[in-house]
Amino acid sequence: MASPLNRPGLRAAAASAALTLVALSANVPAAQAIPPPSVDPAMVPADARPGPDQPMRRSNSCSTPITVRNPDVAQLAPGFNLVNISKAWQYSTGNGVPVAVIDTGVSPNPRLPVVPGGDYIMGEDGLSDCDAHGTVVSSIIAAAPLGILPMPRAMPATAAFPPPAGPPPVTAAPAPPVEVPPPMPPPPPVTITQTVAPPPPPPEDAGAMAPSNGPPDPQTEDEPAVPPPPPGAPDGVVGVAPHATIISIRQSSRAFEPVNPSSAGPNSDEKVKAGTLDSVARAVVHAANMGAKVINISVTACLPAAAPGDQRVLGAALWYAATVKDAVIVAAAGNDGEAGCGNNPMYDPLDPSDPRDWHQVTVVSSPSWFSDYVLSVGAVDAYGAALDKSMSGPWVGVAAPGTHIMGLSPQGGGPVNAYPPSRPGEKNMPFWGTSFSAAYVSGVAALVRAKFPELTAYQVINRIVQSAHNPPAGVDNKLGYGLVDPVAALTFNIPSGDRMAPGAQSRVITPAAPPPPPDHRARNIAIGFVGAVATGVLAMAIGARLRRAR
């Protein structure tokens, strides 16, 4: 990524948290000197009709999110105010920008126009969210305000991009379910059957993914549930880009599993759920081919750096979407405490030649580590301070609000901000995590794309990065180049910069040149010489015979 602007006053007020390496098992993985990953364009997956690669079944009840006291859903979300979205609307509202949300599906809502993009879980249309995650992510990106703020006028007045391929946006709320299912456990973090351990080869089902909302924190105080606002009452759920169009692609879910699931251990939570790195790759290609100009991926797979598995198909898909189809790809950095995820070192003062500390990476976050094509997003709190549990790594590009989150319910359509307890003695779990930080940045990307449609995907990322509020060191592995500033991204005089990431081309694997045709010149000369000699000898013999005959 390009270096950030050196502007006084744009340093974040937050200082980076002290590094504590967290492992999910007793074995702490050794650091690995890994470079940014290369990609092989020959591995781009075909864009077939979305569907599962094996029979799937429903294994859990759908999640029913609730409303807790804090944050107050009757007020604007603190993150909305922190990054000053309402002022950014003076310059852009993301009018007509197609934003693909590769997640757990999006339930239609009158405040959230959404286009069906397909379903890699059950082969449906993607307009169903059993995990109450994709709908919340989409709410942060593009929900229309209700009551507290008026709907802004579309900016720019004319959409800069054609509508996405497929049916027109769905704006009607779905029919209410006949029976409300009991609450399911809150969507656990990413489901990688490989634990953080020294380098055994990845298991066959490594790379399974799930929503990257934060895991429960037993040290937090319990937030009591409160009644939601009555239907139609003003609420604080407001999207960053309310005139963008969501393309919903259901790729992952904790409520579904293969008909013949494998298990990584006796704990049922370790069973492989729906969603893998390969299905993310296919979803990325499909989203790009539908015309998405921003692709939000709020799911994360964490693998040990010593054995990151075969990610060639995913890398090729990201390359294709970003460079061939010109889509801005935004991904959650991941949360320390999710399955397989842990903080990487921040900086090695003994190796200033590697300022992002790639050589000490212990855990890879995918797709974030494909930083030539992906803008990875870390999380800050409501005051702009770095979240200690936001996963650090050299791929983190920027940060955005990741706490005090609210969104629209996939069931009733009203405001929600937490998951209920799943077992006796557990607490309500307010929404938090880098999933929602990525959604903020996807909304900002939609604002920038609408205002500057001539910029390439990488130039849009460059503008977001260069206008961010830098951390004290200018850049670090927790916040990247700092907290996003939508107003600055839309108004600062920032050179467009390179059309592609400068280092990207050097990491593209090109097919080997075909071998040169065989050189038969020596053989041909020899054959010609032998033929000439033979012809001469034959001519002399015939001439001698003719003379004797006379």
From Swiss-Prot:
The chain crosses the membrane at residues 524-544. It is a single-pass membrane protein. Pfam families: Peptidase_S8 (PF00082). One of its GO terms (molecular function) is serine-type endopeptidase activity. InterPro entries: Peptidase_S8/S53_dom, Peptidase_S8/S53_dom_sf, Peptidase_S8_Asp-AS, Peptidase_S8_subtilisin-rel, T7SS_pept_S8A_mycosin. Keywords: Cell membrane, Hydrolase, Membrane, Protease, Serine protease, Signal, Transmembrane, Transmembrane helix. The active site is at D103 (charge relay system), H133 (charge relay system), S435 (charge relay system). Its EC number is 3.4.21.-. It is found in: Cell membrane. Residues 79-490 form the Peptidase S8 domain. SUPFAM superfamilies: Subtilisin-like. Residues 34-62, 168-236 are annotated as: Disordered. GO terms for biological process: protein processing. Residues 168-190 have a biased composition (Pro residues). Induction: Constitutively expressed during growth in culture. Residues 1-33 form the signal peptide. Belongs to the peptidase S8 family. This is Mycosin-2. It comes from Mycobacterium tuberculosis (strain ATCC 25618 / H37Rv). The gene is mycP2.
